[in-house]
């Protein structure tokens, strides 16, 4: 679905953005008090029925999604609905600043939902500094009714980016492994959903075990490992068509795949003669190229965002540790030297950090600089693992396994380690992979 800036919103008001004010959220050291923000329901100039509901109801639903997104970031404290004013369509561009000042809000989001003659919707999004009585930014989105949630996520992204200075991440998807059944006989299916758990659907039927799904940069392709005929093999799945194909037709076990940043290459591990090494192959298939040659197990490769380097895990030193090498396999260097073992490394899309699972008295998710310095543990569950980065590199999704039951759930945490929250899924979930920002 392509989004475009609306060309006629409240008499072209969206094209007259004022100069930026100074209201902002500082997220560099964590937030003691989230910013109070008001997000009233979005009015409509004329109630019209759409396949997704009438525009009046959609206005409230859009506001609810924006509220949920910003609240979940941990940086904002949306006012309760009981403290909100009912906004009329003319008030969208003329806020009642006196009311909102008395409400305690520092920032205000107002907008509208309008049905267009071609069957599309226009969703307008405006951000105001309440104390300075200034408009900070505005944008409009033209979408099909079925895509109204994406317009809401885009609005939340607009506000988040303007007030934090960080990149957006709400308009994105997650692919993961949905699990059900007893822990000794789990049924595992690929599933995909919006980052907030909405629009959930299953991609595979559970007849084979699937693990470690990873998005391609084009967001329409997933690579993953599947046990077929009792053999681990790497596949590629097309989300649009539902088709899947084998990446490498080898008699050996292949697993832990991941796309390169340009989507042209898949890096994976292959077990040959009792030794496991990292290989790369064209995403379209072909002859694999071996990148590591050390004794032991080398696996869990993850590219740097510029594609020049790869972080991976290896037990070549006697314990499971993290290493970084050039994308062609040269210049391999260990970067983890703390107590315990390290695995499931993931390079931040910002390029500045590496997330990992640390094993030592438990499983915990942490981050470090790309040279291994500045290690910081973010979680303290019984078994937390499998970190995956948000598109802006500020939030990490992982899965947490409960002691005893084997029940696994998806969670997210920010880089401060303070804002930890569960991610809703209809069944148990593991191996999350956060996809790029949608176009």
Swiss-Prot record:
Similarity comment: Belongs to the TolB family.
Lineage of producing organism: Bacteria, Pseudomonadati, Pseudomonadota, Alphaproteobacteria, Sphingomonadales
Source organism of this protein record: Rhizorhabdus wittichii (strain DSM 6014 / CCUG 31198 / JCM 15750 / NBRC 105917 / EY 4224 / RW1)
UniProt subunit comment: The Tol-Pal system is composed of five core proteins: the inner membrane proteins TolA, TolQ and TolR, the periplasmic protein TolB and the outer membrane protein Pal. They form a network linking the inner and outer membranes and the peptidoglycan layer.
Function: Part of the Tol-Pal system, which plays a role in outer membrane invagination during cell division and is important for maintaining outer membrane integrity.
One of the protein's GO biological processes: protein import
Chief place where the protein resides: periplasm
Alphabetically ordered keywords of this record: Cell cycle, Cell division, Periplasm, Signal
Signal peptide: 1-21
Compartments (UniProt record): Periplasm
PANTHER family in alphabetical order: PROTEIN TOLB, PROTEIN TOLB HOMOLOG
Protein name as catalogued: Tol-Pal system protein TolB
InterPro entries on file: 6-blade_b-propeller_TolB-like, PD40, Tol-Pal_TolB, TolB_N
GO annotation, cellular component aspect: periplasmic space
């Amino acid at each position: 679905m392509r989004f475009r800036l609306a060309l006629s919103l409240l008499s072209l008001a969206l094209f007259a953005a004022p100069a930026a004010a100074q209201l902002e959220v500082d997220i560099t050291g964590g937030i003691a008090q989230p910013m109070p923000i008001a997000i009233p329901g979005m009015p409509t100039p004329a109630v019209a029925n759409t396949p997704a509901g009438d525009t009046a109801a959609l206005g409230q639903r859009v506001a609810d999604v924006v509220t949920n997104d910003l609240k979940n970031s941990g940086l904002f404290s949306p006012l309760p609905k009981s403290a909100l004013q009912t906004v009329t369509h003319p008030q969208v561009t003329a806020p009642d600043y006196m009311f909102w000042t008395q409400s305690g809000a520092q920032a205000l989001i107002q907008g509208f939902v309008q049905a267009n003659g071609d069957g599309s919707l226009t969703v307008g999004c405006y951000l105001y500094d309440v104390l300075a009585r200034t408009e900070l930014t505005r944008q409009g989105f033209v979408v099909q009714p079925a895509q109204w949630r994406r317009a809401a996520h885009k609005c939340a992204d607009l506000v988040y980016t303007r007030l934090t200075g960080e990149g957006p991440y709400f308009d994105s998807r997650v692919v993961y492994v949905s699990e059900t059944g007893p822990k000794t006989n789990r049924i595992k299916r690929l599933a995909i959903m919006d980052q907030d758990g909405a629009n959930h659907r299953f991609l595979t039927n559970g007849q084979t075990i699937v693990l470690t799904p990873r998005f391609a940069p084009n967001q329409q392709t997933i690579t993953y490992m599947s046990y077929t005929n009792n053999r681990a093999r790497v596949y590629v799945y097309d989300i649009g068509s539902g088709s899947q194909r084998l990446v490498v037709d080898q008699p050996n076990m292949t697993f832990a795949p991941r796309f390169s940043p340009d989507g042209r290459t898949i890096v994976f591990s292959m077990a040959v003669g009792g030794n496991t090494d990292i290989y790369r192959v064209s995403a379209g298939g072909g002859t694999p190229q071996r990148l590591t040659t050390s004794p032991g197990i080398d696996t869990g490769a993850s590219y740097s965002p510029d594609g020049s380097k790869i972080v991976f895990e290896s037990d070549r030193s006697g314990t499971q540790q993290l290493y970084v090498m050039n994308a062609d396999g040269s210049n391999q260097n260990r970067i983890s030297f703390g107590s315990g073992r390290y695995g499931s490394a993931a390079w931040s899309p910002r390029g500045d950090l590496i997330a990992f699972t640390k094993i030592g008295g438990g499983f915990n998710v942490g981050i470090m600089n790309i040279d291994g310095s500045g290690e910081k543990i973010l979680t303290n569950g019984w078994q937390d693992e499998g970190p995956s980065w948000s598109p802006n590199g500020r939030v990490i999704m992982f899965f947490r396994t409960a002691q005893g039951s084997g029940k696994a759930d998806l969670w997210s945490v920010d880089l401060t380690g303070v804002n930890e929250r569960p991610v809703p899924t209809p069944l148990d979930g593991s191996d999350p992979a956060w996809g790029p920002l949608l176009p």
